[in-house]
Amino acid sequence: MASFLSFLLGEKKQTASVAKERLQIILAHERTGRSHKPDYLPALQRDLIAVIAKYIHINPNDIKLHLERQDNLDVLEVKIELPDAK
């Protein structure tokens, strides 16, 4: 009977550790799976164009947003090509 209980208890620990490993794999995959653009980037680009257009005439295609992951950080790079001063 004791071996049967230890077998059952041992299975629970093993099952728990397997579930924990699977959860860690899923979380790691979700953290690194941010290769696609977030939903807010197009709206952010439109807002930037609207704000900059209040002050200078700018072509909307001259604003570029790029999101990349560096180590554990998401880095948003904004490039704005300003017109030459006249």
Curated annotation (Swiss-Prot):
GO terms for biological process: cell division; regulation of division septum assembly. It comes from the Bacteria. Keywords: Cell cycle, Cell division. InterPro entries: MinE (IPR005527), MinE_sf (IPR036707). Transmembrane segments: none annotated. Coiled coil: none annotated. Prevents the cell division inhibition by proteins MinC and MinD at internal division sites while permitting inhibition at polar sites. This ensures cell division at the proper site by restricting the formation of a division septum at the midpoint of the long axis of the cell. Belongs to the MinE family. This is Cell division topological specificity factor.
